[in-house]
Amino acid sequence: MEQTSQVIFDKNSIEFVTVAAEYCGFIERARDAERKTFVDTALKILPLLYLKASLIPECELIGEEDLEVFVTEDDYEMVRRAVAHVMGPQDDYLEVFHPDMAYSDTPIKKCISEDLADIYQDLKDFICVFQLGLNATMNDSLCICKEHFAEFWGQRLVNTMRALHDVKYNISTDDDADDADAPSGWDNDEDEFDFL
């Protein structure tokens, strides 16, 4: 158990937990943001999240049970829709690092909102398990999150950063000024997070 405590209370682990919690809060507040502010903040928090995830110390699973899942399909969909609403027509981008791209003659379309919601789901489940304060489950959630970063959401994060960079810096004639304040039409008061 000593090794477990060293990993979960390591400086890099604690910093990752802090940034992951900040990311989750940022995504949960997305529906209140204007696109420009949202994109600017995302382009600051995503590289930090990537850096902190890459510094998580090596760890090994110690439990045999699956960890509790906190983010429901409804929660995921609410986050995805909120980000899609903020991004508007700039939510879509062309994926160039998809494995199927080698066999495709046509571009593969992805959505910033789906990528950010996928990252959110993994991190929110991690944060919720970590907040329970049980060393064994904290360790396992950290190990699983590190594994998912390497295999899944790390690549989505950098792909999404590329798309967000394009939204911020690519001057497009298709984008009109009214598009910048997309959240003003958001009026669905039913959407609440079950776990908050």
Regions found by a protein language model. Give the residues of each.
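Long amphipathic alpha-helical segments
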Residues: 58-127
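N-terminal interaction modules that seed assembly of large macromolecular complexes
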Residues: 2, 7-8, 14-72
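Surface-exposed polar/charged interaction patches
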Residues: 23-33, 48-59, 82, 86-89, ...
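Phenylalanine-focused residue identity feature
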Residues: 9, 16, 26, 38, ...
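Acidic, proline/glycine-rich low-complexity IDRs
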Residues: 107, 122-196
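Residue-level recognition of alpha-helical structural elements
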Residues: 34-38, 112, 134-138, 142
